[in-house]
Swiss-Prot record:
SUPFAM superfamilies: Hypothetical protein PH1602 (SSF103365). It comes from Entamoeba histolytica (strain ATCC 30459 / HM-1:IMSS / ABRM). Residues 1-16 have a biased composition (Basic residues). Catalytic component of the tRNA-splicing ligase complex. This is RNA-splicing ligase RtcB homolog 2. The lineage of its organism: Eukaryota, Amoebozoa, Evosea, Archamoebae, Mastigamoebida. InterPro entries: RtcB, RtcB-like_sf, RtcB_euk.
Length: 535
């Protein structure tokens, strides 16, 4: 047996490589951890017999955590498994909540029929970020968990296509970056340029993107290319606290901060010509725009409000208090579900208002109408949400509440819940990379419905804490590297650029290729950035 001190003396070479690529949160005094070999990797000895390696999966066996209702799993190739083994060492030596443990913990919740994590997963609040957890609703104890959705409710991504080519905007790139940065407020606490009344804000929470269409800020056809057509039913604004409303009503059309961004991109490679054509993307060099943001202060406050309510109720006593929840059909469960839907509708409208500003900015700089530039929405997807869906459980159709936290719905061809335009190819899943790297568009598969509740990854996935990124990297170097790559970067606080550096994230290509190898989604095309707007 080997003994591991995770920062210096690991004997497993693969673990050492993971160690170089992954960075912990606050370090605590080290403890020696005895390790054993697992398929060529060093894992803590206490986990002996707790895992099974399958193609593109790490199966976490029932019993890894007491009270698990079944096995759990993480989709990963060998390189991504390296990172997980390092987290396991930290879990034991530092009491660090690893993604593996969090995925297993979620499998203990009442009513759960599946707990899994995507290749981009990393530890988060209670649930891993990249986690998918489904509970069967014919179990009266099945819970809904605010922490299983996260603080940025309906954080999501949308992609807008154009008929422009790279050469059409190359000479206007700097001015276009400036105009987008001016038109779209970004950064912590920023407010929108268009202020809505409290009454209108309630309408936005009920109607989502429909409100923008009715008031001339979005196109009718945008609705058909948005998950849930941009409006989730059962959204009652009276269940959203005044403090949450006060944080959100001036933020419709704002980007926010952290890993949220707007990118002007070009199509770099098309892997599935027919699927790309269905999306209106036909040429290498075609210009697209990607937007990644969510429900801003509104979603954060709603999540906190209902976490507090769930904890006070004492109904659910999970193995980790951050997993707190209540039965879905209980009064608090239904109140949270409705308030969450209000935030989701706000987020659809937020991305819709940003799109309105993008279209204006392109018109200002290029002196063409947005319709002439074919600035149509390809798709808008959520990746922090809980939804009622029908899935096969034990060979029966069962209604489930599916929590996706840092995971994208990716339904297969012919699924009734996707747009008619995409019935033949499957639901598009928009996957953003890290700052300065490529992004991808995927589509769902039939196998994904069986393996992952119709879910795939949502991005690259953080491997380095923000604090550690700032310690190890310099923002000046990150900004200079973007310039050398020919990328126009506009960022509200340049001192924080290192937080979002490429080195702080996993390789998005490796992530999406793992999803494809696991057959839970299929790669359609790749994009690379020309302009990056950050909060």
């Amino acid at each position: 047996m080997a003994k591991s001190r995770y920062s210096r003396k690991n004997k497993g070479k693969k673990l050492q490589r993971a160690q170089q690529n992954t960075v912990s949160t606050e370090e605590k005094p080290e403890q020696e951890v005895e390790t054993i070999d697992f398929n060529g990797f060093q894992i803590p000895k206490v986990y002996d017999g707790k895992f099974e390696r399958k193609p593109m999966e790490l199966e976490i066996k029932k019993g890894f955590v007491e009270g698990m209702n079944g096995d759990a799993k993480i989709f990963c190739n060998d390189d991504l498994l390296n990172l997980l083994t390092f987290e396991m060492i930290k879990d034991i030596s530092n009491n660090y909540p690893s993604c593996v443990r969090q995925t297993a913990n979620a499998a203990t919740l009442p009513g759960v029929v599946g707990s899994l994590a995507m290749p981009d997963a990393h530890s988060g609040y209670g649930f891993s970020i990249g986690g998918v957890v489904a509970m069967r609703l014919d179990d009266p104890e099945a819970v809904i968990c605010p922490g299983g959705v996260g603080f940025d409710i309906n954080c999501g991504v949308r992609l807008i296509r154009t008929n422009l080519q790279r050469e059409d905007i190359e000479q206007h790139k700097a001015r276009l970056a400036d105009e987008l940065f001016k038109q779209i407020p970004s950064g912590v606490g920023t407010q929108a340029q268009i202020a809505f009344s409290p009454e209108d804000f309630d309408s936005i929470m009920k109607e989502g993107l429909e409100f923008l269409v009715e008031n001339g800020y979005a196109w009718e056809e945008d609705l058909n290319h948005c998950e849930e057509h941009g409006k989730i039913a059962n959204a009652d604004p009276s269940l959203v606290s005044n403090s949450a409303k006060s944080r959100g009503y001036k933020q419709v059309g704002t980007l926010g901060s952290g890993n949220h961004y707007l990118e002007v991109q070009v199509v770099d490679e098309i892997m599935d010509v027919e699927a790309a054509k269905a999306m209106g993307i036909t040429e290498i060099g075609q210009v697209c725009i990607m937007v990644h943001c969510g429900s801003r202060g509104l979603g954060h406050q709603v999540c906190q409000d209902y976490i507090n309510l769930c904890m006070k109720s004492g109904i659910c006593n999970p193995v980790d208090k951050q997993l707190t929840g209540v039965p879905f059909n209980s009064p608090i469960g239904q109140q949270y579900y409705s308030a969450m839907n209000c935030c989701a509708n706000f987020a659809f409208a937020n991305r819709g208002m940003i799109t309105y500003r993008i279209r204006q900015a392109f018109e200002t700089v290029l002196r063409m109408k947005p319709k002439k530039m074919d600035m149509h929405l390809v798709y808008d997807v959520c990746h922090n949400i809980a939804k009622v869906e029908e899935h096969d459980v034990d060979n029966k159709k069962v209604q489930c509440i599916v929590h996706r936290k840092g995971a994208t719905r990716a339904f297969p061809p012919q699924h009734p819940d996707i747009s008619e335009d995409y019935k033949e190819i499957g639901q598009p899943a928009i996957i953003g990379g890290s700052m300065g790297t490529c992004s991808y568009v995927l589509v769902g598969t039939q196998e994904g419905m069986k393996k992952s509740f119709g879910s795939t990854c949502h991005g690259a996935g953080r491997k380095m804490s923000r604090t550690k990124a700032m310690d190890n990297l310099t923002s000046k170097d990150v900004i200079n590297r973007m310039k050398e790559m020919g990328i126009e970067l506009r960022i509200t606080d340049p001192k924080l650029a290192a937080e979002e550096a490429d080195e702080a994230y996993k390789d998005v290509t490796e992530v999406v290729e793992t999803c494809q190898a696991a057959n839970i989604s299929k790669i359609v095309l790749r994009l690379k950035p020309l302009i990056v707007i950050k909060g």
